[in-house]
């Protein structure tokens, strides 16, 4: 079996697994890992097929979750950004006893827009899939640019994301298509109502991929969960607002310790 790239760092007494989003790799967390490493034992992961976890083809959401969970500590907080939020959610549903808390960042249990659901239009996701086969590099860059659009530091943040992608091996087109297929088809809205553990959802108000309307809808659907919206952030709040982002995680850790 191919190996998943996994790095453990930090000296905190609380394990925190960090899962990145589509097209990227674990280097996205470098802007906050130093700050968090004195409070958590961090588990930095390249999802199967991404970055240094080469040798995988397109996977289903369940397959990806099972592969990542097989390497994880017995108990941890699971944090997933964007596509990684779906993977973390699937782990929480499949192995709830191993998840101390679920944190989703700029993520949705259903990314695709529907008649009564805000999300990414189906034709946009299909367009990205089609464009991947025509101009691989440009399609990835376009998707990255969408993630920072609207913020005060949009260009700078987009450059950070691009450098992260280029610093490690690129995922293959089949892996990227598989990830887009998960974003098109996954719908965990009903399944996540069964999750009984702590659930923190973090959003950027300027996010053009996961609209802020999603936060309010999920507040109603998951009344025991908590949500926080970073007012001037877009799809990558940990890059544009690292201090506030870390504060939210430290506050969660404190709440868990006082349970």
UniProtKB/Swiss-Prot annotation:
GO molecular function: pimelyl-[acyl-carrier protein] methyl ester esterase activity
Pfam families from the UniProt entry: Abhydrolase_1
The protein, known as: Pimeloyl-[acyl-carrier protein] methyl ester esterase
Annotated GO biological process: biotin biosynthetic process
Residues the entry annotates as binding substrate: 22, 82-83, 143-147, 235
Keyword Hydrolase on entry: yes
Active site, renumbered: 82, 207, 235
InterPro entries xrefs: AB_hydrolase_1 (IPR000073), AB_hydrolase_fold (IPR029058), BioH (IPR010076), Carboxylesterase_BioH (IPR050228)
Swiss-Prot/TrEMBL keywords: Biotin biosynthesis, Cytoplasm, Hydrolase, Serine esterase
Pathway: Cofactor biosynthesis; biotin biosynthesis
Its biological purpose: The physiological role of BioH is to remove the methyl group introduced by BioC when the pimeloyl moiety is complete. It allows to synthesize pimeloyl-ACP via the fatty acid synthetic pathway through the hydrolysis of the ester bonds of pimeloyl-ACP esters.
Domain AB hydrolase-1: 15-242
Gene Ontology CC entries for this record: cytoplasm
EC numbers, comma separated: 3.1.1.85
Catalytic reactions of this protein: 6-carboxyhexanoyl-[ACP] methyl ester + H2O = 6-carboxyhexanoyl-[ACP] + methanol + H(+)
Species this chain originates from: Cronobacter sakazakii (strain ATCC BAA-894) (Enterobacter sakazakii)
Family the UniProt entry places it in: Belongs to the AB hydrolase superfamily. Carboxylesterase BioH family.
Lineage: superkingdom: Bacteria
